[in-house]
Amino acid sequence: MKKIELRPNGTKLVHTVNELPPETDQSFGKECDINFIVKKFIKTGQITHLARRQGFYGDQSSIPDFQTAMDTVTKAQQAFDELPAHMRKRFANSPHELMQFLQDPKNRDEAISLGLMEMVETPQQAPQSTTNQTTTKPAPASGEPTPVPTP
């Protein structure tokens, strides 16, 4: 609720009054006081107010901004919704179930038969020799520059 006072010079002074009970738990006030934390550390040598779990850290630099992520999710949902009803039912109408299915290599043949994947033939490559092949050239005559070895 706002309380408005009119000052003698004609300007208004607006106070915001919160009549709701406070949402903070005052019983933790002492534990949050830096002076109390330091005194307790000096006395016991322990810092007990820290989290008891190890933090989780990761490289998040490749994650797009929130809007881009939401657009990606929306496009994925729309693509899933365009599948035939019997196929959506096969995955319990859940894009997550479909993703789990497609990520499992054991399901590759079924995914191809359902038309969710295409069979891609990998070209056969000639076996490469693992031995080092070096070419030897006769030593240069005196006064000639030494050639750079070729790999």
UniProtKB/Swiss-Prot annotation:
Subcellular location: Host cytoplasm
InterPro entries to which the protein is assigned, alphabetical: Chlamydia_phage_Vp3
Pfam families: Chlamy_scaf (PF09675)
Gene Ontology CC entries for this record: host cell cytoplasm
Signal sequence segment: none
Sorted UniProt keywords: Host cytoplasm, Viral capsid assembly, Viral release from host cell
Domain of life of the native organism: Viruses
Region described as Disordered: spans on this chain: 120-151
Biased composition (Polar residues): 122-137
Known function: Participates in the assembly of the viral procapsid in the cytoplasm. Internal scaffolding protein VP3 is released from the procapsid upon genome packaging, possibly through affinity displacement by the protein VP8, or by proteolysis.
Designated name of the protein: Internal scaffolding protein VP3
